[in-house]
Amino acid sequence: MKAAEIREKFLKFFESKGHTIVRSSSLVPGNDPTLMFTNSGMVQFKDVFLGTDPRPYSRATTAQRSVRAGGKHNDLENVGYTARHHTFFEMLGNFSFGDYFKHDAIRFAWELLTTVYQLPKEKLWVTVYQEDDEAYDIWAKEVGVPTERIIRIGDNKGARYASDNFWTMGDTGPCGPCTEIFYDHGPEVWGGPPGSPEEDGDRYIEIWNLVFMQFNRDAQGNMTRLPKQSVDTGMGLERLAAVLQHVHSNYEIDLFQNLIKAAARVTEISDLTNNSLKVIADHIRACSFLIVDGVIPGNEGRGYVLRRIVRRAIRHGYKLGRKGSFFHKLVADLVAEMGAAYPELKEAEQRVTDVLRQEEERFFETIEHGMSILEAALADVEAKGGKVLDGELAFKLHDTYGFPLDLTADVCRERGMTVDEPAFDDAMARQREQARAAGKFKATQGLEYTGAKTTFHGYEEIAFDDAKVVALYVDGSAVNEVKAGQDAVVVLDHTPFYAESGGQVGDQGVLANAATRFAVADTLKVQADVVGHHGTLEQGTLKLGDVLRAEIDAHRRARTQRNHSATHLMHKALREVLGAHVQQKGSLVDAEKTRFDFAHNAPMTDDEIRRVEQIVNNEILANAPGIVRVMPYDEAVKGGAMALFGEKYGDEVRVLDLGFSRELCGGTHVHRTGDIGFFKIVVEGGVAAGIRRVEAITGDNAVRYVQELDARVNEAAAALKAQPSELTQRIAQVQDQVKSLEKELGALKSKLASSQGDELAQQATEVGGVYVLAATLDGADAKTLRETVDKLKDKLKSAAIVLAAVEGGKVSLIAGVTPDASKKVKAGELVNFVAQQVGGKGGGRPDMAQAGGTDPANLPGALAGVKGWVEERL
């Protein structure tokens, strides 16, 4: 049974049991800022389990794309060297939100495994938590598993409820026992059942974990039963496929074998058992799906993890002898394997290929450059009789040049050496500490709120008269009262304030009554449907239960709405002008501008920018109404609505039709396109490989920008004594004149250098058969200095020369040495001798070198020392 069929049978089985099939969420978690990547099926349901995200269903099933690389859950270094570690994997799961519990969860699992997948019952073992008699009895008495194949696992991790068979969401919160199902590969494979000394062997393999969220644990460790008990299960598709396909390694299943063969093809390797091919096959899945979900290789956060995975794959290709790009060529093979299950992969195929190709090309340059630095450093260590490479240097290679530590370690091993990894770790820790110190956190992050959700009135109203204070926070802690002058976060039961979301900034405004005035500087989400008003109490005292008038800054909101609506029109126009591959990758919409990041691999031309502006302004002139509808997500997408990167959507979504644009959007917008007024793009540039950024302005901002631009054009025309319409022609004339004058000036400088060279030659002093000259050449630039040195070398035949010039407090130095003398006197060392005395440094070839300095006062003394320096070396 192929992996694709296994996935489909799982989802269809649970659908037949009343479960809603929920699409895989993004690998970038939308509901948990503490999590690097989505690493299990329950991540997208975390708020559902906590009761803060109501859904229209109580049973769900998913095939969730997951990544474990970076952060707490990091399998990267094991990938390719064990049978079951992956960076990317698919987690099959079924979930109950206060619906069924242990009986049905266990019964469903047994039926699917033994009836649908037809696994032999005698091959299945189960574990339960030591104290979970209920689960034990269900397995033994209802399902009929022999008691010798049911194993109780107690607290085996050194604390109460710390067990392989007891699951917790954190130190506090929902938790409960779990039961795990294992498959026995038979006595021909070494290993013992779970809980035995031989449990780490490969005979008994865990294939499914059923978690029963039964309790809530408080800060004191007390356990109370949850009013609504839930189920969260997870089964790795790759592990299950290995069992059903009768192989002992996940890399032997059909999906991986096809990718391994493809990796062998592009690296021109015939040995399909090579571990490097497994690494490459695994990594193409993780890298491709991360890029699909909007992650771009970078130097921090998720982008850095992606870059590390890409570079690890490239390094393994390099180890196989592949010296050119190859990794991006596997995207088409991955699409062939997984595109049917994940259409978003097929849609993004070209973009993923382009991003990987660019990253490869960049890193191959890094490998070549890094290897030269590393080889030089190792040669130096060997020359001194050492066996350990300095960890600080390894960190510099990693941090400055992107050279991975594991590659550095591999090269060292080949030379019989090691890396000082503790020193490397110390350097890395210092960098991380600096990064943490520089981090900023939103005022609402981490606030504990258990009340009702906020009712939002901001689509229709700019003020609400009877808003009640239901929560107050100062310095991250809940309080009953806020005093004048304190910064705080206020939660109301009703509000017209829009909380920052979907790229749109939060509203500003005022919360007030007769005795109190609270200035709202920002509005942020405390939870999905809970709005926090962050600001300062300017007057009075604010207490829980107070009733206030909540009023937004209507002028600021109107300007923000213009920019947000223009963003929708611009997004559509970009797709029309540049192509359907354009996909939003991020945005920031405030009262001043809209900033829009999108997938595209080339700078926009002036003509493309003009066409986008024209399309958007035509839509503005059409003055089309904005029409908002609420409908099921699937219906909206089928109807052509665009879902945007980084957004988490529920099952019911808000669809905005604005002119020719249709998008899912929860933000605030103009009533008609004409309200935008005028649209102008002011910035276009690149922010990462395959990602462009456009900034645009609207309304009075755009009009003011054009007026200021017009004024500058008129000023420039007046300065050049031309009409604005003649400006381009006049500038071309001036440029031609400047080029002609520069040519004349260069000729004059050359003549001057020649004449000065004749004079300077007479100042040279002979030392050991070599003429030594150190002098200042007034008014010369670097080019003139070089030409003069060349003429002097020709004239003097055997010479060591340093010429200097001073301009604007900066020293320029050129050193030249004739070939006969350069074995003993090197120009690079000579110029550095002078440069170090004038606050600079430099370098170059043995026969010609240059340097600069910032301390001209020491120049005469430095030049005077040249003769003695040369004499010492002859």
From Swiss-Prot:
PANTHER family: ALANINE--TRNA LIGASE, CYTOPLASMIC (PTHR11777:SF9), ALANYL-TRNA SYNTHETASE (PTHR11777). Its cofactor is Zn(2+). One of its GO terms (biological process) is negative regulation of DNA-templated transcription. The gene is alaS. The lineage of its organism: Bacteria, Pseudomonadati, Pseudomonadota, Betaproteobacteria, Burkholderiales. This is Alanine--tRNA ligase. Catalyzes the attachment of alanine to tRNA(Ala) in a two-step reaction: alanine is first activated by ATP to form Ala-AMP and then transferred to the acceptor end of tRNA(Ala). Also edits incorrectly charged Ser-tRNA(Ala) and Gly-tRNA(Ala) via its editing domain. One of its GO terms (cellular component) is cytosol. Binds 1 zinc ion per subunit. The keyword Heme does not apply. Keywords: Aminoacyl-tRNA synthetase, ATP-binding, Cytoplasm, Ligase, Metal-binding, Nucleotide-binding, Protein biosynthesis, RNA-binding, tRNA-binding, Zinc. Belongs to the class-II aminoacyl-tRNA synthetase family. Zn(2+) binds at residues 564, 568, 665, 669.
